[in-house]
A protein has these predicted regions:
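Glycine-rich phosphate-binding loops of nucleotide-dependent enzymes
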Residues: 1-408
């Protein structure tokens, strides 16, 4: 909290006692929180770490305006509520807030007025009343109605039910977190995986892509059993993964956008291990244009891009491959509504081309709008297999929260 603004004794040494007392008083007086200032950052929750960041900007009492850029993106709902409450108290203290977020419910709850940007230009200045109208706000942000967010399918997986499944999982277990998981994905089918935190969604994805070892069960691609002990083996078997943590699992942040896009198809842009830079840049430019990745500069380090454009760069990496199964793990986490629309459209196009798609997401409306079927997990087991036609959001949420098992 005091980095760069340390309290010191008259002899120049760090006055830790005074800094600890000031930090403790700040948390207590500003937010009515009891946080021990002597605790190590690594031992704090994500929400507490975020509060420390906020406190560092405010501890000297000089700040009149605080800019928050996606402050709750990595947080669970309860943690996000804690941070939002702290921000509201700042407003009550007369501090100006500039709040940047793609979470529309937070914008509606926290902000008095807004500014909407699309493709780098201002398209509107919604007042507080309009901020409460999610449908109107999404239309302003995306340029079309919310009903058009999930593009219609050109084909249906039901037409190819006689074909061998793209993915066939039988009695998959890891001995700890998952037990006896069995399901298929047909060519051209989008299958969602839903479940509460800790239900096993992330473990299932890791087992399928060779990030964890299965203790029992089989995984088959196009009817052929595969041993998937590493991501390399999974990729060779015809799988592609868009991971849940793009910054740590999906991107090489210092590398350019072009380098990240071409990672899965280096053979197309190199000869005997030597890269043809012009060929690599041309391939990247093609995908940048097709997916509307902004800014459209293939040489720009990917760390400077927004979360939505980073996610589209990872998706572009796999679209040019011959992968048969696409695993999308939290594909729109931390992604703005415009990028979401592009990702949904590309996902539907993959299915229309006969690829299988597995979408693991904590966003129930997303699964309902995007998928043909939804697998629901509960405490490491598959408890429901729900066709989305005719399925309501309320019924899905009841099942996710431990409701009645159906059609397993």
């Amino acid at each position: 909290m005091f980095l760069g603004q340390e309290y010191r004794t008259r002899w120049g040494a760090l006055d830790r006692r005074r800094m600890n007392a000031a930090a403790e008083a700040f948390f207590r007086d500003s937010w009515q929180l009891d946080i021990n200032p002597r605790r190590l950052i690594r031992d704090l929750s994500l929400a507490e770490r975020k509060l420390v960041q906020i406190a560092r900007a405010l501890i000297d009492g000089a700040a009149k305006l605080v800019v928050f850029d996606e402050p709750t993106a990595p947080l669970e709902a309860q943690e996000a509520s804690l941070v939002s409450s702290a921000i509201l108290r700042l407003r009550e203290q007369g501090i100006g807030i500039l709040y940047i977020s793609h979470y529309l419910n937070e914008i509606a709850a926290l902000c008095d007025r807004g500014t909407v940007l699309r493709n780098g230009e201002v398209v509107g200045y919604p007042d507080r009343a309009l901020l409460q109208d999610t449908d109107a706000l999404i239309k302003m942000m995306v340029g079309r109605d919310i009903e058009q967010l999930y593009t219609p399918r050109q084909s249906s997986a039901q037409q190819v039910d006689a074909a061998a499944p793209v993915l066939s999982v039988r009695h998959l277990s890891d001995g700890v977190h998952l037990n006896d998981i069995t399901f298929d994905i047909q060519p051209g089918e989008i299958v969602g995986v839903a479940g509460l935190l800790g239900a096993g969604r992330d473990v299932l994805v890791d087992l399928l892509y060779g990030l964890r070892r299965a203790r029992s069960g089989t995984i088959s691609i196009d009817g052929q059993p595969k041993r998937l002990r590493t991501p390399y083996q999974a990729t060779r078997a015809g799988m592609a993964l868009v991971p849940r943590d793009r910054r740590h699992q999906g991107l090489i942040l210092p590398f350019s956008t072009a380098d990240n896009i071409n990672l899965a198809s280096l053979a197309e842009t190199a000869t005997f291990g030597w890269e043809h830079r012009g060929r690599a840049l041309a391939k990247a430019r093609s995908w940048i244009e097709q997916l509307s990745i902004r800014p459209g500069r293939p040489e720009l380090p990917v760390r400077f891009m927004s979360g939505g454009n980073q996610q589209k760069a990872i998706l572009a990496r796999w679209l040019g491959t011959d992968a048969r199964l696409f695993i999308l793990d939290e594909p729109t986490l931390g992604v703005d509504i415009g990028a979401r629309s592009d990702i949904y459209q590309r996902t539907r196009e993959l299915a229309d081309r006969g690829r299988g798609v597995l979408v693991s997401s904590s966003d129930a409306p997303e699964l309902l709008g995007l998928c043909d079927r939804i697998l629901v997990m509960w405490r490491g087991e598959l408890v429901a297999n729900l066709p989305t036609r005719g399925l309501t959001l309320d019924a899905l949420l009841v099942t996710i929260n431990g409701g009645q098992e159906q059609q397993v």
